[in-house]
Amino acid sequence: MEEGSKENCGFNGSPMGSRSPPKQLTSAASVLGEIQIAAANLKTPTKPQERNNADPWTPTANLKMLISAASPEIRNREREILEEQFSGDELEKTLPSRKEKSLGLLCHKFLARYPSYPNPAVNNSICLDEVAGELSVERRRIYDIVNVLESLHMVSRLAKNKYIWHGRLNLSKTFDALKKVGEENRYGEQIQLLRKREQEECDSQNSPNAETQKPLAKQPEVGFVELPGLEFRAASVNSRKEKSLRVMSQRFVMLFLVSDPQIVSLEVAAKILIGEDQLEDLDKSKFKTKIRRLYDIANVLTSLNLIKKVHVTEEKGRKPAFQWTCPELCTDDQENRSSPAALTPVAIDLSSPKENCAKNLFASGGKTFTRHPSLIKLAKSIENDRRKINSAPSSPIKSGDGSSSAASKMAQLAAICKQQLQQSRDQTKVKLKVSACKAKSTVKQPGGSDKNQTPTYCRAIPLLHPHPSAAPPYTVIVQPPQEQTLSRQSPPALGYTNRTPPEAPLQGGRHEGDGTSHSEDHSAQERHPKRLPESDRGCTSKRMKSSAVDDVTETLYPSGYLIPIHLAPVAPEPSKENTGPSSENKLFTSPIPGVFPLKLMFSPGPVTAVPVMSRGGQHVGGGSGSASRSPSPGMFTFALQNRELISAGLPQGATVSPRNGRGQEELSAASVLNCKHVSPVPYHGQPFTVFALQQSAVPVTPKGYHSLQETFFRTPGGMGCSPPESARKLDVGTDD
């Protein structure tokens, strides 16, 4: 109660009791004001939203800032690594110099890839992507060179990153056109006014009068000067060509062609090309950028040997300038060198249809072409794909290896010498082809010498092949290789060779001092005119005379074997052969001195045929239409078995001689390289045909001495004995 009374008393007893409500009102108003202020403060969070809109925090928004911040650190790390590996002079050698990275040297390498006066009939297209990759430079550096070359019409644009190389064929026409445009725009007068103004500025600091400023302020805009036939009417190029580097390059060349002393400084060129009215608006940094672009143009023109750098001494000091060094226009030398280009428009029409198609599609004037909507969609899709491909970063990847600089130098040298090496390779290929053709075309002639006919790895085996009209005996002369000589440990063979009876010579084989061989040959042909062969008509070589036989005998060797093989006739023979002298008592004598005869007897059984390359028949003079056939396979089989050229291990084979006692290699068809028709010679009234057969160079000598037996000398058909049936089967048919 006391507290309540106190409150009531205090409330009622206060002299200012009537004023307390207003005080409460004022306090409430202050509270409301604070609340309103607090509510007003609630709007402040909207400001960070505005900052976010200004600088959005996206992954790619500050990519440039991150790269610029990280690139110095990356470069410093690379330098530290190089400094650790190299020190002093070695570090300077590894780092590329400014000269290696200069635009002038790059332009020299670019020009070395292409001829100065190309053939317009050849497709001389240039792909900038390939050139940038081969020269290992950025693509923008190639663009700078190509833009300057395009201003001089040394190249023309075919498509995106595709150009056609014209070389110096159009330089004289380009200089004529540029000089005319420069005279129309009064560039010579402007150069003189600027030079006078510089002199006046040196004398006094006063500004030049208005009369001298008018020509510079009101200079007309000069577009890109195009030659007839080399225009490119693409709208995308024409929209920005006034600001391109190639237009500035043309104007820079105009200043040299028009000025009286053909020396122009970069400051004067920049003032004329940019214009003094624009120089006031441009900053110093932009003006310096323009001068740098002029430096790039001057470097390319210097590499083309059109200008050279000089220094001009003035009152202010020494200034760099450039002097025109190109010879006079339209000289006779240039016309003579460019004379192969008289058919340039026709050749261009044939070699570059894409360029003409592009010109027709973007033709200017009243006549225009429209595309079908489907083609427009297709063209847009192709352009989008090309943009995606070309938008990829073209800067080269820097490798951490120390040999990258050496590799780049070698690549640049290879790019410079590529054309010369390609020409030398083409010449060497042609020479190799010619030599290979000559080696293949060396065919062995029938009547040639033995050196040309016989290769180094094998020798010839001469064979005497009789005309098989009446199945006379075959005679085989087997010649060993040149390297083979009869060993001294085989006296029986030598002795048996000496025991050859001289009273039974082989008819048709001429010996030294034998004068009756020719007459016997003639008489044998007269006695048997009907037995001359008919198949000799198709032979590729003619019958050799007795003198030709001498040539053959000179090439043979004294360690051969003479193998007479008699084949029984298929049909019954006339009685003339039986009434003749007994041939069984005679031994065959080799036409070569030192060659011993060898008689064979067939055993009944089949005989394996040997594939032999034989020539066709040849017509023999003196015959009455009769024909000869190629040697029988059986004869070659037994002859080569005796020579140990093929194996005789077949069942019921032929037993040749006692010396054939060991295994022998089989003669393959590839080892018989040549069968040569030498000469037909008669023997006992029966004509023989001599063949030359190539033999392997493996030396084969008789293995031992065997006693002479009766069966060894027995000739089939001799001493009144009938020939075996197996011998009759050998001469059944001819081998074509």
UniProtKB/Swiss-Prot annotation:
Residues 15-26 have a biased composition (Polar residues). GO terms for molecular function: DNA-binding transcription factor activity; DNA-binding transcription repressor activity; RNA polymerase II cis-regulatory region sequence-specific DNA binding. Residues 393-405 have a biased composition (Low complexity). GO terms for biological process: cell cycle comprising mitosis without cytokinesis; chorionic trophoblast cell differentiation; hepatocyte differentiation; negative regulation of cytokinesis; negative regulation of transcription by RNA polymerase II; positive regulation of DNA endoreduplication; sprouting angiogenesis. Residues 98-167, 240-326 bind DNA. InterPro entries: E2F (IPR015633), E2F_WHTH_DNA-bd_dom (IPR003316), WH-like_DNA-bd_sf (IPR036388), WH_DNA-bd_sf (IPR036390). It comes from the Eukaryota. Belongs to the E2F/DP family. Homodimer and heterodimer: mainly forms homodimers and, to a lesser extent, heterodimers with e2f7. This is Transcription factor E2F8. It comes from Xenopus tropicalis (Western clawed frog). The gene is e2f8.
